[in-house]
Regions:
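Single transmembrane alpha-helix segments in multi-pass membrane proteins
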Residues: 1-53, 58, 75-79, 217-224
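Transmembrane alpha-helical segments in multi-pass inner-membrane proteins
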Residues: 186, 190, 196-261
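Helix-loop-helix "hairpin" substructures at the membrane interface of multi-pass membrane proteins
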Residues: 68, 124-209, 214
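Membrane-interface helix caps of multi-pass small-molecule transporters
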Residues: 21, 46, 50, 70, ...
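Cytosolic-side transmembrane-helix boundaries in multi-pass membrane proteins
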Residues: 159-166, 170-173, 245-288
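Alpha-helical transmembrane segments within multi-pass membrane transporters and channels
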Residues: 19, 52-92, 97, 135-136, ...
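Loop-to-transmembrane alpha-helix initiation sites
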Residues: 8, 84, 127-132, 175, ...
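Transmembrane helix-bundle core of multi-pass membrane transporters
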Residues: 83, 87-90, 94-147, 177, ...
């Protein structure tokens, strides 16, 4: 059970990392997440059931997510459609696209080789190592990218768009690039989770943005004054912590049909804690 919870936390952390690219760096509330996440699962599962190598299927899923990000980016930067509306439009479109890809509302992985099956250990250990390898790879690639001149221009766009433009940075292109990369990472999470769970479903994206945000917020509540690398690692810690919280809710006997409600309550609590701490504990010193 412990290994299973950590495995889920590691893979779901990839979703949090993708959301971090837009929500925290660009200050862009991208609703496309709830479309690109299940889209990644739909593409990977469909290709795997047709005999495609699971690594290639996962790569194709990332490409599909990038296309979803490109669509919302063009609607926002070129079409001048507001952020939330452009995300909702693409998210809604993804639902129909997934039905076209799978030919049905859900599709299972039976008697197929999945990405974690490449490893020679038990199923639980394979899933744990797969999650650890992929989340580490995503963090390293993000750190490498954000340390380049292009990455610094991307960060500057999110920090202060007007100042970035004064330095000759094309902020529209930076936003477009960020949405493409972010949704590619989110689709990767969707592909890995679909393979971990053994199926893809068009409704799998409902509420996943709450899970991703919970990973960010829990990590930020637990840790303060961090470097970029440390912030990315805290997303992983936050994701695993969130999975333990969900497991605790289920273990207490609560109805699992209301899991999305519990998820929203957990996120709301984590968002409220910092403000309550500032309001009631500011300036309070504990006696030795």
């Amino acid at each position: 059970m412990l290994i299973s919870i950590i495995s889920q936390g590691l893979v779901w952390a990839i979703l949090g990392l993708g959301i971090f690219m837009t929500f925290r760096i660009l200050n862009f509330p991208d609703m496309t997440t709830e479309g690109s996440f299940p889209l990644g699962g739909a593409v990977s599962v469909t290709l795997i059931t047709q005999g495609v190598n699971p690594f290639l299927a996962t790569l194709a899923a990332v490409g599909a997510g990038c296309l979803a990000g490109l669509a919302v980016g063009l609607l926002y930067t070129k079409g001048k459609i507001p952020t939330l509306l452009s995300g909702i439009l693409v998210m809604t479109s993804c639902h129909s696209i997934m039905l076209m890809i799978m030919g049905r509302a859900n599709l299972g992985l039976l008697n197929t080789k999945q990405i974690q099956d490449v490893l020679p250990f038990s199923s639980e250990i394979n899933q744990l190592l797969t999650g650890l390898i992929f989340v580490t790879l995503v963090i390293l690639l993000m750190l490498f990218f954000l340390d380049t001149k292009l990455g610094q221009a991307y960060i500057a766009t999110g920090d202060n768009p007007d100042m970035a433009r004064s330095f000759g940075i094309n902020t529209g292109r930076m936003e477009l690039m960020g949405l493409v990369l972010s949704n590619g990472v989110i689709a990767l999470a969707g592909a890995l989770i679909a393979q971990q769970e053994g199926y893809a479903d068009v409704s799998r994206g409902i509420g996943v943005i709450v899970v991703g945000l919970a990973s960010l917020i829990i990590g930020e509540v637990l840790f303060k004054s961090l470097t970029l690398a440390e912030r990315l690692v805290t997303i992983v810690v936050g994701s695993i912590s969130y999975q333990f919280l969900v497991w605790g809710v289920i273990a207490l006997g609560f109805n699992t049909s209301y899991l999305r409600l519990y998820s929203a309550l957990i996120l709301a609590t984590c968002l409220v804690i910092p403000s309550l701490k500032d309001k009631y504990l500011k300036g309070v010193k504990l006696s030795k």
